């Protein structure tokens, strides 16, 4: 039922299998008559033992992992590192006389647009330009979404005042009193992952010539990996501080998190098993789909997957999302039991009349989503003009604030990748990223009875022992700066010199930031 946590599910699950009152009384009278009082205790003990072993065999049990899961509910060790992007070098000066205006149109999904905003701010800084409030592409959501419907505009502008100038709209003219020109932004398409030098030369030249340039589309059009640490710190200031959601979204998130926490700690899972995602990944066969309407939706979608690879091959190398059943097996192997409260983020997961979630729900019945926790009236409170982005925005915040976050498919998934980085920034919060390439063969062997339960548990935990669960670590080849902003956006008092040394008092002149921000995220962000 929408708007209610399913306390009844927990009660029903706990009481499952209990015998009714009257049949049990009749059975008890019969046993006393047949056996007599002397053998009754022995008989009762025998019944209890049979019942116990029967329950043990009802579903997969991973007993040796039970104690392991407790460590995941705590944050990972910080090793003396703390988030810090407020510190600026002496060379970092407030914006000077502007070279012109930068207009950007951010395309893609919710988090891809968020990353594009971060890149737009940095591009404006590189060119010493005035940034016009970024435009959010609504073709993806087919609604009237706009920046003010999702983010706190005034807070965004104020937070970045010492980094870039931001205006809400493009003025009609620009220039000195005697040399003003009518602004007509020059359309420019930057190369993918363009270098800072491209903005300092090609883009800046056109800006000075026309007074304004418009970069469209603008998503992955500024290199992620830059040697300039100050540039990377600016990205963190935008992503983790300036991009604060509107009051409506933050208030709704606060209600959702409060209701979840009333049940205890909770885990969030970004379950990428929507039909659209499977189609784009080139993995429709993993669903065993028979519904004609669903198959038609698959056929209408373009795939970004390598057409030379069959779906089974993509799956074997980890290019397909984990199935809900595999997610359940993964959780059991890691030591979580069926009392674990799980918040599912992502789109609708179904197969016509059959739910893909049934196997996962059978193992973990306490599954919640935005629609099951929030009341319809509460969802209606949010600005209707931004409804296409509100769901992902709330999901993002609920996942950010969860005790454990598990993304089942991180590529390509800006949502998961950006969340992993932000959870790292706000106190090294636990993230378990399943190694799909290593795990899928194990799940397949288990499905085919090649691997026993105990062997599956040991193998899964061995695979995951090689993965970081959220502590500070160097970026590997598969991680971008947005996935792992360490060490650029962190500091340590153990570092005696250099830009990663924690200052005695951080520069907080234009940030809602304090030394213990990562410990007070809920108070500050929600």
Question: For the regions a protein language model found, what residue spans apply to each?
Answer:
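N-terminal targeting/anchoring "stem" of glycan-biosynthesis enzymes
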Residues: 2-526
């Amino acid at each position: 039922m929408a708007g209610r946590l399913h306390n009844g599910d927990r009660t029903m699950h706990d009481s499952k299998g209990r015998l009714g009152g009257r049949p049990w009384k009749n059975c008890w009278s019969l046993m006393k008559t047949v056996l007599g009082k002397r053998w009754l205790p022995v008989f009762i003990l025998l019944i209890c033992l049979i019942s116990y072993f029967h329950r043990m065999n009802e579903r997969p049990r991973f007993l040796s992992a039970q104690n392991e899961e407790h460590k995941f509910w705590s944050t990972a060790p910080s090793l003396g590192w703390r988030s810090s992007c407020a510190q600026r070098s002496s060379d970092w000066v407030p914006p000077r006389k502007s070279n012109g205006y930068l207009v950007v149109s951010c395309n893609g999904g919710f988090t891809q647009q968020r990353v594009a905003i971060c890149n737009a701010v940095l591009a404006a800084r590189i060119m010493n330009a005035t940034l016009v409030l970024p435009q959010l592409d609504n073709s993806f959501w087919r609604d009237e979404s706009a920046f003010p419907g999702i983010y706190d505009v005034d807070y965004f502008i104020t937070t970045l005042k010492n980094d870039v100038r931001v205006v809400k709209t493009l003025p009609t003219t620009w220039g000195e009193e005697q040399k003003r020109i009518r602004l007509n932004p020059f359309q420019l398409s930057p190369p993918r992952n363009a270098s800072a030098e491209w903005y300092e030369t090609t883009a800046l030249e056109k800006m000075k010539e026309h007074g304004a340039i418009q970069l469209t589309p603008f998503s992955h059009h500024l290199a992620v990996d830059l040697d300039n640490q100050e540039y990377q710190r600016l990205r963190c200031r935008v992503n983790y501080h300036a991009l604060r959601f509107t009051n409506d979204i933050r208030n709704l998130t606060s209600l959702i998190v409060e209701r979840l926490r009333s049940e205890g700690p909770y885990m969030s899972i970004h379950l990428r098993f929507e039909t659209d995602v499977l189609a784009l990944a080139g993995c429709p066969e993993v669903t065993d789909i028979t519904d004609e309407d669903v198959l038609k939706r698959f056929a209408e979608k373009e795939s970004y997957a390598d057409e030379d690879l069959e779906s089974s091959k993509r799956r074997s190398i980890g290019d397909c999302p984990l199935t809900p059943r595999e997610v359940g097996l993964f959780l059991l192997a890691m030591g979580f039991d069926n009392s674990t409260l799980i918040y599912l983020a992502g789109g609708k997961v179904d197969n016509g009349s059959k739910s893909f979630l049934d196997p996962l729900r059978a193992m973990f019945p306490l599954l919640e989503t935005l629609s099951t926790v929030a009341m319809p009236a509460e969802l209606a409170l949010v600005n209707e003009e931004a409804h296409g982005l509100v769901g992902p925005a709330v999901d993002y915040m609920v996942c950010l604030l969860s005790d454990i976050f598990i993304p089942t498919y991180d590529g390509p998934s800006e949502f998961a990748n950006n969340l992993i980085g932000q959870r790292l920034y706000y106190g090294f919060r636990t993230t378990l990223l399943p190694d799909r390439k290593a795990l899928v063969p194990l799940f397949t062997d288990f499905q085919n009875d090649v691997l026993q339960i105990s062997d599956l548990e040991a193998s899964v935990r061995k695979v995951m022992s090689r993965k970081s669960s959220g502590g500070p670590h160097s970026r590997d080849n598969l991680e971008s700066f947005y996935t792992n902003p360490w060490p650029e956006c962190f500091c340590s008092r153990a570092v005696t010199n250099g830009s990663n040394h924690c200052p005695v008092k951080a520069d907080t002149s234009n940030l809602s930031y304090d030394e213990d921000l990562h410990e007070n995220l809920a108070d500050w962000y929600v």
